C-alpha cells in the first residue's frame, strides 16, 4: 500500500505542475521528481503505470472544464447535473484502469440527502435591559433551520454568550461548566483558542473549531439556537461567503436521534458587539474571558423569538469509489483513502450578468 500512497501523492504534484519541460526551474524540478515517483509506483502495477502516463496537466484541466460546463447545471446534489458528473467521472476512472470499489461491484455508493430550505426572515429582533435591537437579514445576520421539519421556532429564548462552546476532556477544556442551557440561544465565537501551540493544534483548525461542531455542541446542551460570531480571521473567509453559502437549499444527511437546535445562524462582528453592549458587556472583554479554561457561560439578559417556514425535500446522490489494489500482500487489508467532492451549488439566484449556474 505504500506504493499506492506514493503514486497518488505524486500525481497530485504532477497535476498541479506545468507541462513545459524547460530549464532547471523549481517547477520543472518538482515535475521531474513527480515523474520519477510515478514511474517507480507503476512497477508491477499496470493500473498505476497507466495512470502515471495518462494523468497530466492537460488531462486534469480537461476534466475540470468538462464538469464545470453549463450542461452540468452546477452539479447540485441529487440533480441531473450531479448524475451526469458521476457518470462522466466513473468513465474516467475506468479509462485509468481503476477498479470499481462499491460493495455491489459498481462505482457508486448511493445515499439519501435532505434538502432544507429555510425562508429567511427580513429581520430578527432582540430585547432586554429596556432596549431593543432589530437585525437586518443579509447585512447583519444569516439564519438556517436546525431541524428537518416544515417550521422552525424559537420563543422568548435567552441569549447566552458561550465562548467557543467547546467540550474537550483531552485538553481539560469545558466552556459549559454544567450550566443549564436548556432552551437558550448561544452566542458563540468561531474557531478555537490558538494562544497555546500545544492547545487545539495551535493555529491549525481542529474539529472543535468548525461551525458544524459549534451547532452540534449547542444542541447537546439543549439550546434551541446557536449563533456564530463571524470574523474573517477566525473563519478564513469574508462574511460574503456566509451570505452566499447559507441561503437557499442546505443539504444534510437524514436526521437521526441526535439532539438538534431549532435554528443556526451567523452574525457579523459589529452586530455581535452591539448585542452584548445592550447587556453592558464589551465583546473584547468577553473574548478575553473565553480564552481561559475557567470561562463560564455569560447570560446576557436578552431574549428573542423567531419563526421560519422550511421547505424539505429528499434526494438521492452517490459517492464514487475507485480502487487501485496494492502490491504488498501483508498490507492488502489496509486502504489509503483520498477524497474530493464532485458536486457544487447547482442553480441559484442570477448574478448581474443573468447567469444563475454555479459552475
Where are the regions a protein language model picked out?
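Bacterial signal peptide processing site
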Residues: 17-20
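Long, well-ordered, tryptophan-enriched scaffold segments
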Residues: 220-233, 237, 245-318
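Extracellular/luminal Protease-associated
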Residues: 136-255, 260-263, 325, 333, ...
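C-terminal motif of bacterial Sec signal peptides marking the signal peptidase cleavage site
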Residues: 13-15
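N-terminal hydrophobic or amphipathic helices/low-complexity stretches enriched
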Residues: 22-102, 333
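Noncatalytic luminal/extracellular "stalk/propeptide" segments of secretory-pathway proteins
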Residues: 66, 73-198, 298-301, 310-312, ...
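Sec-dependent signal peptide recognition
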Residues: 2-10
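Acidic/His- and Gly-rich active-site-bordering loop/insert found
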Residues: 67, 93, 268, 316-351
Amino acid at each position: 500500500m505504500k506504493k499506492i500512497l506514493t503514486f497518488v501523492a505524486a500525481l497530485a504534484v504532477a497535476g498541479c505542475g506545468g507541462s513545459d519541460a524547460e530549464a532547471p526551474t523549481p517547477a520543472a524540478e518538482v515535475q521531474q521528481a513527480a515523474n520519477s515517483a510515478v514511474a517507480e509506483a507503476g512497477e508491477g502495477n499496470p493500473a498505476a503505470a497507466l495512470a502515471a502516463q495518462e494523468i497530466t496537466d492537460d488531462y486534469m484541466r480537461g476534466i475540470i472544464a468538462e464538469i464545470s460546463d453549463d450542461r452540468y447545471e452546477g452539479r447540485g446534489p441529487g440533480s441531473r447535473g450531479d448524475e451526469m458528473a458521476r457518470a462522466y467521472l466513473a468513465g474516467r476512472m475506468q479509462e485509468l484502469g481503476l477498479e470499481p470499489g462499491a460493495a455491489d461491484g459498481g462505482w457508486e455508493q448511493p445515499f439519501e440527502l435532505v434538502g432544507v430550505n429555510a425562508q429567511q426572515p427580513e429581520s430578527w429582533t432582540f430585547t432586554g435591559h429596556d432596549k431593543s435591537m432589530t437585525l437586518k437579514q443579509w447585512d447583519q445576520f444569516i439564519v438556517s433551520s436546525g431541524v428537518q421539519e416544515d417550521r422552525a421556532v424559537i420563543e422568548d429564548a435567552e441569549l447566552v454568550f458561550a465562548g467557543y462552546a467547546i467540550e474537550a476532556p483531552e485538553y481539560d477544556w469545558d466552556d459549559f461548566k454544567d450550566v443549564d442551557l436548556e432552551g437558550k440561544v448561544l452566542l458563540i465565537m468561531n474557531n478555537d483558542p490558538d494562544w497555546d501551540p500545544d492547545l487545539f493544534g495551535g493555529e491549525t483548525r481542529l474539529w472543535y473549531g468548525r461551525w458544524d461542531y459549534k451547532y452540534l455542541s449547542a444542541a447537546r446542551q439543549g439550546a434551541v439556537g446557536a449563533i456564530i460570531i463571524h470574523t474573517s480571521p477566525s473563519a478564513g473567509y469574508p462574511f460574503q461567503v456566509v451570505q452566499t453559502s447559507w441561503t437557499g437549499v442546505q443539504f444534510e444527511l437524514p436526521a437521526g436521534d441526535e439532539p438538534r437546535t431549532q435554528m443556526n445562524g451567523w452574525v457579523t462582528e459589529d452586530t455581535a458587539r452591539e448585542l452584548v453592549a445592550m447587556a453592558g458587556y464589551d465583546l473584547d472583554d468577553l473574548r478575553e474571558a473565553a480564552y481561559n479554561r475557567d470561562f463560564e457561560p455569560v447570560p446576557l439578559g436578552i431574549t428573542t423569538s423567531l419563526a421560519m417556514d422550511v421547505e424539505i425535500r429528499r434526494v438521492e446522490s452517490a459517492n464514487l469509489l475507485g480502487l487501485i489494489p496494492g502490491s504488498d500482500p501483508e498490507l492488502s487489508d489496509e486502504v489509503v483513502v483520498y477524497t474530493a467532492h464532485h458536486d457544487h451549488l447547482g442553480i441559484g439566484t442570477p448574478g448581474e450578468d443573468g447567469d444563475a449556474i454555479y459552475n
